[in-house]
């Protein structure tokens, strides 16, 4: 089944839950989430690490500098090239000290075959993927969820611990305070099996505000 048909089914399902979801889907329009399954596993994980607590624009800027400074052809650096790049150079690209260290750890894990191959990952459930990748130091649940959404394109991921999503969930569900992770999971349970698309729509709420909606 194609991505477009999956998204249409997801939009129809979300719209059928209640008026709030129906209104949000209508205001935002069709889902334009674009995962990149062509990325190697280590690349997808590093991109997820880079994006934490940053805007899309800031993330893209850092990745572009990273590719320019750390590879020979402006493509995403290989694990070997990353290991040959010192923390100071990574910091110049825009990575924090902690993220620089985590990126080195992921690159080393890739070189040591500690990261499953694409074909192996495709056969894994989300629980199996969590168990496998969380063995890599610094790779936590949020990073794996972002990898599952933006690289693998899995449709039923709810990153309930994401701070931005919690803020949007507070507004969307009319809560008096920022929800706990468990509450987000409970509130979005009706969105199964399309929780990734539900998360994407919640992330669009600030854009609606900027448009005055």
From Swiss-Prot:
Which keywords does the record carry?
DNA damage, DNA repair, Nucleus
- Sorted alphabetically, which PROSITE patterns does this protein's record hold? ALKYLBASE_DNA_GLYCOS
Q: Which GO terms describe its molecular function?
A: alkylated DNA binding; catalytic activity; DNA binding; DNA-(abasic site) binding
Pfam families referenced in this protein's UniProt entry, alphabetically:
HhH-GPD
GO CC annotation = nucleus; protein-DNA complex
What is the organism of origin for this protein? Schizosaccharomyces pombe (strain 972 / ATCC 24843) (Fission yeast)
What the entry lists under InterPro entries is as follows: Alkylbase_DNA_Glycosylase/TA, Alkylbase_DNA_glycsylse_CS, DNA_glycosylase, HhH-GPD_domain
Name the UniProt record assigns to this protein? Alkylbase DNA glycosidase-like protein mag2
């Amino acid at each position: 089944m194609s991505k477009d048909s999956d998204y249409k089914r997801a939009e129809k399902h979300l719209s059928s839950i209640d008026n709030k979801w129906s209104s949000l889907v209508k205001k935002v329009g069709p889902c334009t989430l674009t995962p990149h399954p062509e990325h190697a596993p280590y690349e997808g994980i590093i991109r997820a690490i880079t994006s934490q607590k940053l805007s899309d624009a800031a993330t893209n800027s850092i990745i572009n500098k990273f590719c320019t400074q750390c590879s020979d052809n402006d493509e995403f650096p290989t694990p070997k090239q990353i290991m040959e790049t010192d923390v100071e150079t990574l910091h110049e690209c825009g990575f924090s000290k902690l993220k620089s260290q985590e990126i080195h750890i992921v690159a080393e894990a890739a070189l040591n075959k500690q990261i499953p191959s694409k074909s192996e990952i495709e056969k894994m459930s989300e629980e199996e993927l969590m168990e496998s990748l969380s063995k890599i130091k610094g790779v936590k649940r949020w990073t794996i969820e972002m990898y599952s959404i933006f690289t693998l394109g899995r449709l039923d991921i709810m990153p309930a611990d994401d701070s931005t999503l919690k803020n949007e969930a507070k507004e969307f569900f009319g809560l008096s305070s920022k929800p706990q992770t468990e509450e987000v999971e409970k509130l979005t349970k009706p969105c199964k099996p399309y929780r990734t698309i539900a998360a994407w729509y919640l992330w669009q709420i600030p854009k609606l505000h900027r448009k005055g909606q």
